[in-house]
Amino acid sequence: MPEFRVWAPKPALVRLDVNGAVHAMTRSADGWWHTTVAAPADARYGYLLDDDPTVLPDPRSARQPDGVHARSQRWEPPGQFGAARTDTGWPGRSVEGAVIYELHIGTFTTAGTFDAAIEKLDYLVDLGIDFVELMPVNSFAGTRGWGYDGVLWYSVHEPYGGPDGLVRFIDACHARRLGVLIDAVFNHLGPSGNYLPRFGPYLSSASNPWGDGINIAGADSDEVRHYIIDCALRWMRDFHADGLRLDAVHALVDTTAVHVLEELANATRWLSGQLGRPLSLIAETDRNDPRLITRPSHGGYGITAQWNDDIHHAIHTAVSGERQGYYADFGSLATLAYTLRNGYFHAGTYSSFRRRRHGRALDTSAIPATRLLAYTCTHDQVGNRALGDRPSQYLTGGQLAIKAALTLGSPYTAMLFMGEEWGASSPFQFFCSHPEPELAHSTVAGRKEEFAEHGWAADDIPDPQDPQTFQRCKLNWAEAGSGEHARLHRFYRDLIALRHNEADLADPWLDHLMVDYDEQQRWVVMRRGQLMIACNLGAEPTCVPVSGELVLAWESPIIGDNSTELAAYSLAILRAAEPA
């Protein structure tokens, strides 16, 4: 018979409801309640706290077939009490140096399910992708959302296909030698369906922009930390994910001697040894703090890699000319060159946006560039714009190609956001489907007020609750094979193939990277061994003082003995001639 266990130190009485039958539970001194009850494999169950007749879902629920406010359903990972997995031959691979593809299951396809996404995996293989990174798939209130307001971290969002759908998706990825990363949000809980405070002290007094913080350093926080780490390991052990992207780790306020991220990294290394395959943790952080990716033996946390917004900002502003908000300190080619060579632009320097010093220098002799992720756009960089407009909606094809070349041609681990490889015309706007009218109204009003401060008219801001906002974010796959979209797609595919096949592009050390530029003529050259990535960021043709064998180009460069003429907004990748 299955055992039911729940950590609930707060209530004086906890009872188990299985398919409507109520059972007593026994409390241990550590706040765990437990009982053993005969229950079908698909039983619906939940917990009754004190004298409240409301049946609450299991905080560690594996499945919520009727949403986050309803009863949980028993579910066991395949291979334990059900059918065997089909990916047992998958050896795994490290994420360092890979090409990652970030996608949102709900908008990646028309159907918005794991099974529909499986049908696009061969396309990703042909593109040259190494890892798929799923935006959060944990359960959240409503049917539509980015997933970052999850409240039942252990369960899989049912409209996507639930836990069985995720198993099928990961097996299908592994059959094609694609790794899978899952975006995990441990810094806050969503505003709808969060019953954890009824069970125990899961929340802290420390708040962040998204809500109450998580109690990872206060009284009774040991079990909360276990809750986080067990959840993280479960994605990799039970679902066979190859790693996690950890959302906004700077919002994890931990004053203990061993940070929860270091504890998680240690547990992940242990699980990797048990499973016999590599597992990766990628931290999203805005602190430019290399201690995250420094080995524990050298005083770091031992996280595999981290997102790097400085590289995005440096490339985006140099190409687009945008300088608003946190772009204020970026924009020049000098800034671009410095950031590409050093990993961070702000490394203890003054940030005008933050109005203080920011960041810490990266030891480029000890930490390879593959520990940092470079990208031209992400769900954040697109979705946090007022209209959710992609770079493809305001830049030329040549400008998009330049951004891609500087990113994929760099020594950093690279990441694409779904559809960028063909210049998708669909936006990626903020959307949600809160079932509570008051919460829905406050979310819509808050979005409009936020952008009104930046000069946007309220009527211009998409309504996140409107189903059409969600619908317009779905990729239009038909355009990927037509016209300029197809041309950009071919360029991306050729560029990724070059990255995979050229030994010089696999060199992870920034000390070997050279970047030349001319601020007035608007050209930049990134040198990777014998390869030179020459880009004209200007609106007029220009001559770049490099020459060699043409490897790949956007537009048609004129290559001379000592220089190359580039058309406006174009690039050429050249191979230097071998010394005579």
Swiss-Prot record:
Q: What does this protein do?
A: Is involved in the biosynthesis of trehalose but not in that of capsular glucan and glycogen.
Where is it mainly found?
A: cytoplasm
Q: Which reaction does it catalyse?
A: hydrolysis of (1->4)-alpha-D-glucosidic linkage in 4-alpha-D-[(1->4)-alpha-D-glucanosyl]n trehalose to yield trehalose and (1->4)-alpha-D-glucan
Segments carrying the region annotation (Disordered) are 56-88
Q: What does the record give as the organism's lineage?
A: Bacteria, Bacillati, Actinomycetota, Actinomycetes, Mycobacteriales
Tell me one Pfam family matched here. Answer: Alpha-amylase
Name one molecular function that GO assigns to this entry. Answer: 4-alpha-D-(1->4)-alpha-D-glucanotrehalose trehalohydrolase activity
Q: Which organism is it from?
A: Mycobacterium tuberculosis (strain ATCC 25618 / H37Rv)
Write out the annotated subcellular location.
Answer: Cytoplasm
> Under which name does UniProt file this protein?
Malto-oligosyltrehalose trehalohydrolase
GO annotation, cellular component aspect: cytosol
Q: Could you tell me where the Basic and acidic residues compositional bias lies?
A: 60-69
Provide the active-site residues from the annotation: 247, 284
Q: Which SMART domains does this entry report, sorted A to Z?
A: Aamy (SM00642)
Pathway-wise, it operates in: Glycan biosynthesis; trehalose biosynthesis
> What processes does the entry annotate via GO biological process terms?
alpha-glucan catabolic process; trehalose biosynthetic process
Query: Which residue ranges does UniProt annotate as crossing the membrane?
Result: none
